[in-house]
């Protein structure tokens, strides 16, 4: 399932960050957007380059190419040899990495503020001058396949998640795993990665987010110095793909060695489209919080603590999606002696209770207070401040919607929460994936291994 809830990301840091921090937005002549959030608590800076290119933009037969290119971006340019990017950042006392999702690919560094020019120099260089050789690709694609084995093939719940995505989405690109299918990775070529890089890696398809002990105007000058000379590209036309309405429940069973069964179920729901007028996504966000937003939420109370049907149970919803499609998901691990059927029935019972009886004002206030209470927490993560800005901008909205997010949540009524449950959490709109545990071979060894750039 995609990120479980944008609410979680907001809880990492206080909402006052956006009310009080100085945020400035710039745009270079080549189309690169720069957003700077000044944070002068410590002499540190976080720099993130976000490309609007993720698995959403891939085509069948080349799944995983966005993530493969992320790996290849560390393989050097004419000026910087393979692996030297990471060594230069480390030598400056910094940290760096990258990640790929359905909607974007992001590269980031965290450094002492005087080293921001190094970050900009390296990122601008590889934005335009990546040397993607057949030799380096042949080595790195094997690393990616190992990562796929480690992330998915070795993990029963990951297998369920992948099967669920393929079942819940039949036409939409969100059906494809970000890491790619193994067959596609085995048949991928360096030319496929080069094509991806040439199509999407351009200043007019990127957002540069800087958070830290800096002055916005100085960062703008530095960005123009390093990124301003890069040429924009004519980007491929993105063809919208809409998932047809589901007209009947779907089920998929995954058999894999595991200790316990597992249940993952979800309903098609809308993602945020118009931040000014949409109310349903905010009501769905609150509904997820009512079910699983805190220890007193319904699923934990009813399924885990009272009936002891499940070891854990949760609900989640991501209102931010560039593909403008989302899933209201629920998952649970049955307690020993209980079945996935027991847990599924209990989850649906909780949903039906909300559809029939609604939610209490107390529950609603508890969920809303969870977000508002984040105001009292000390801001300690520049990285997540950048994450929020970069995610929203890359998805296609303005970071400014964060300022109104708490007000949107406050405005949600019990009637609206009940209304979205009645409208979307329907039997014919349901997809269920379950793990059927098979005996574990005590001599079996993991197939894959993790990767760090």
Residue ranges and their predicted role:
Residues 149, 166, 235-296:
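His/Glu-based metal-binding/catalytic segments typifying zinc-dependent metallopeptidases
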Residues 75-79, 127-135, 151, 356-360:
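Short, polar/flexible loop-turn hinges at active-site or ligand-entry regions and domain interfaces
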Residues 18-34, 215-255, 261, 268, ...:
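Proteolytic maturation boundary segments
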Residues 1-3:
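N-terminal secretory signal peptides that target proteins for export/translocation
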Residues 65-73, 287:
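Active-site His/Glu-centered metal-binding helix of metallohydrolases
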Residues 37, 42-68, 82-127, 157-183, ...:
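M16 family metallopeptidases and their MPP-like homologs
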Residues 5-17:
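Bacterial N-terminal signal peptides
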């Amino acid at each position: 399932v995609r990120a479980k809830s944008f609410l979680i990301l907001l809880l990492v840091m206080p909402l006052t960050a956006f009310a009080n921090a100085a945020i400035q937005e710039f745009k270079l002549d080549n189309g690169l957007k720069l957003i700077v959030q000044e944070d002068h608590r410590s002499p540190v800076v976080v720099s993130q380059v976000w490309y609007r290119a993720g698995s959403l933009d891939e085509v069948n037969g080349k799944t995983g190419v966005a993530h493969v290119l992320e790996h290849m971006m560390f393989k050097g340019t004419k000026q910087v040899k393979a692996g030297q990017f990471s060594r230069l950042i480390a030598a400056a006392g910094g940290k760096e990495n990258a990640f790929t999702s359905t909607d974007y690919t992001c590269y980031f560094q965290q450094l002492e503020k005087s080293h921001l020019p190094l970050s900009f120099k390296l990122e601008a260089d590889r934005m335009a001058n990546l040397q993607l050789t057949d030799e380096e690709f042949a080595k790195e694609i094997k690393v990616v396949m190992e990562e796929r084995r480690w992330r998915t093939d070795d993990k029963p719940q990951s297998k369920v998640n992948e099967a669920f995505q393929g079942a819940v989405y039949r036409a939409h690109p969100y059906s494809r795993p970000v890491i790619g299918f193994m067959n596609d990775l085995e048949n991928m070529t360096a030319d496929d990665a080069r094509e991806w890089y040439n199509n999407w890696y351009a200043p007019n398809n990127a957002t540069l987010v800087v958070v830290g002990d800096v002055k916005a105007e100085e960062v703008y000058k530095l960005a123009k110095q390093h990124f301003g000379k890069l040429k924009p590209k004519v980007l491929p036309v993105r063809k919208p793909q809409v998932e047809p309405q589901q007209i009947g429940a779907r089920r998929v069973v995954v058999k894999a060695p595991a200790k316990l069964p597992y249940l993952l179920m979800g309903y098609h729901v809308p993602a945020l489209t118009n931040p000014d007028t949409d109310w349903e996504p905010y009501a769905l966000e609150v509904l997820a919080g009512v079910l699983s937003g805190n220890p007193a939420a319904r699923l934990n109370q009813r399924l885990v603590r009272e009936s002891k049907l499940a070891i854990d149970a949760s609900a989640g919803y991501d209102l931010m999606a560039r593909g403008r499609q989302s899933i209201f998901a629920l998952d649970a691990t049955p307690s020993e002696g209980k079945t996935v059927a027991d847990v599924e029935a209990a989850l649906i019972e909780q949903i039906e209770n909300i559809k029939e009886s609604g939610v209490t004002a107390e529950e609603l206030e508890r969920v809303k207070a969870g977000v508002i209470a984040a105001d009292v927490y000390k801001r300690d993560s520049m990285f997540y401040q950048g994450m929020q800005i970069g995610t929203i901008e890359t998805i296609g909205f303005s970071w400014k919607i964060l300022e109104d997010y708490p007000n949107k949540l406050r405005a949600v009524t019990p009637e609206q929460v009940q209304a979205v449950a009645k409208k979307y959490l329907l039997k014919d709109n349901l997809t269920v994936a379950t793990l059927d545990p098979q005996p574990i071979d005590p001599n079996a060894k993991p197939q894959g291994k993790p990767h760090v750039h």
